[in-house]
Amino acid sequence: DFEYVSSAKLGSAVSFYLAKDYKKAAEALQYLYTADPYSISLTAYLLGASAVHIKGSARLAPVFLQQALEHDSNNYAAVKLLASLAEKNKNTLQSWQYYATLHALDPQNERLAQKTARYQKELGAKAEDYLYYLRLETPIAARVESVESPTVRMALYGLRGQTAPAVLQAVKLVASGPARVQDEKLGTVKNVSAFQLRQLVYNPQTNAVDIMDGKGQVEFSAKRPFTFVLEQDDRTLLVRDAQTQDLFAADLSDKELKGSLTVIPQAGGMTLINTVRAEDLLPALLAARAQDVREEEALRALAVVLRSALLAEVETNPQAAYHITDNGEVFKFNGINLVFPKLLEAARQSAGVRLLNAASGVYADCGPLGADTITNTQTKPAYVFSPANAAKYMLANPPADLVSKPQDSTQWSGVKWAYWIDAKDVEERLSQKTKFGRLRAIEPLKRTANGRVLTLRFTGSKGEYVAQTPQEISFLLGAGSLRSNFFDVAPFYKGKNIRALLIRGYDTGLGAGLCLQGAQGLAKQGLNYLGIIKYYFPEARLLDTKTGKIN
């Protein structure tokens, strides 16, 4: 049986690897590397980690590690080892990029902070130019028709893993049409022509935000909120070159938006709130979540789910300063500059349709079983889905008729994934929470009926800690890199202490709601977007707000 042969080969390889017999480990891994597409990222990492210690093979290590990331960009261990190798080879730029990536995932880690600061200093003032941020000089979309719909307030530059926006020290704005600056008490204080650059800079001496022209001359200074208002609904505003005290607090990419932009001065800087019509925002939210989904009916289904969740946020908190951030778990906004025609069409053709009586969840990839017991296959497993059988599920390969199977047979990491984690990394993250010591045991305290982990207890030599949410579990185990809460853990001990962890898992997110790749597969089978929604939300009612009809 292929599944058990692969598992046995992996077990042999891990045994040799832990015994530091790296040549034999590499030999055992060769079978998996060529025969098992479901474990290729893990296999490539272990081959790279072994190559470091094999005489004459060290040059192959970065090749294998890059392959590990190509097949699974969440492979934290591969980035960590690449950082170490870049440092050893005295490659300042690569060291900075890899350590910056790790630091962004684990911002409270003092060791990573020191490494990042060291290489940032060596690179100089423009270190941020070497991060993977989108940069734009002028609006690209420039002119996009507006659709009448409820307004949404979205905070820009949302902090990673939080529900608050970053405090900015400076930002630049360029509008594709005429605009005005509106003070909440004084009214219009400045008119700005199309494509004229304006700089907003926090002045610590006055605790105000200065509005400057392209030459740096101050035109207006404000201590209270003011708003950039576009005079024409179909024009756009580019927000660029955002600066914060912490480079890693948020994704500081440039982004083009519709609607108005309110600037809120505060101690230490400013925050930005975009007020925009929901249907104008929706195509950009689709762009951030759709990934490689291109089937029109799948995109329409996603549009309905995101619209439903967005309007629910607005209706639940009508008086909130902002309803969402641009970097939340459900909603991500990278700018309307990334919208392509199919996304506009998906939003327009599903306009007015929303879900009732259903949680509007979305997740990228699904295995045979979702958290809500929705199946993505007609193949019946030889066991019952339960916490006791979670390990069997993790071992089993996806069925041939899985509706969410990837087009590329080597890119299975979203459906089935596996990570090697150094226990020292887990101990470092736990030490941020409590006095912990060495990792001794890991125990799931609460699971769902089919085995998803909800709470997890970590026992250390100096104390213990209970992670209370899937998000916290993912951070403590893998700095947020675990793809879902459907996994099992194999600990490897050295004496009383855990040395390393092998984590095997299925699907992404919490496994509830619309599975994007599943929707893609169902669309290819001929289901329209309403059929896809009924498949993933069988208890939901659909409301057409244009006609008032409920299905």
Predicted features along the sequence, with ranges:
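Conserved, single-site charged/polar hotspot
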Residues: 1-41, 45-551
